[in-house]
Amino acid sequence: MSSCSNVCGSRQAQAAAEGGYQRYGVRSYLHQFYEDCTASIWEYEDDFQIQRSPNRWSSVFWKVGLISGTVFVILGLTVLAVGFLVPPKIEAFGEADFVVVDTHAVQFNSALDMYKLAGAVLFCIGGTSMAGCLLMSVFVKSYSKEEKFLQQKFKERIADIKAHTQPVTKAPGPGETKIPVTLSRVQNVQPLLAT
């Protein structure tokens, strides 16, 4: 299993090689004591990689779709209200022998009809979008059951791996009082005081 310093070190070496800059002078080695990895070790291990959940993205999709559908419905209702509540203008007036047709009134009334049509279309698009997104939210919850199953399977796999590995250090048994060879002799590394 690779450590974070190995992963980060390889990335830093690649970045230094690509950047082409060299450092001269006194170097601080604090970076070896503090990990600056933004990625987790588990993301680089093949044993611990799992597929990212499609649940998050589909959740975002249906929420954004529901909001946009609501906006379309409100916009459609507003445009429909304008189309129906604004009174149409009189297009033709006059006597039976002499009738005058107002072209601006004809254009205005056709614009009101277009408002009614556009409002109905926007309302239908928004309603369809809202219905589809609400159905999508139901199907997303069924994905979460599958995801829980995959998480449980992953936890079982991790438990199997932990069960088969031996612990690094064990507490000595009741009859074991041996000192390890490396710790049997303690060597002082501090300089002696000159008296």
UniProtKB/Swiss-Prot annotation:
Disulfide bonds: none annotated. The chain crosses the membrane at residues 66-86, 120-140. Pfam families: Neurensin. One of its GO terms (biological process) is nervous system development. Its main location: membrane. It comes from the Eukaryota. The keyword Transmembrane applies. It is a multi-pass membrane protein. GO terms for cellular component: cytoplasmic vesicle; growth cone; membrane; neuron projection; neuronal cell body; transport vesicle. It is found in: Membrane; Cell projection, Neuron projection. Belongs to the VMP family. May play an important role in neural organelle transport, and in transduction of nerve signals or in nerve growth. May play a role in neurite extension. May play a role in memory consolidation. This is Neurensin-1.
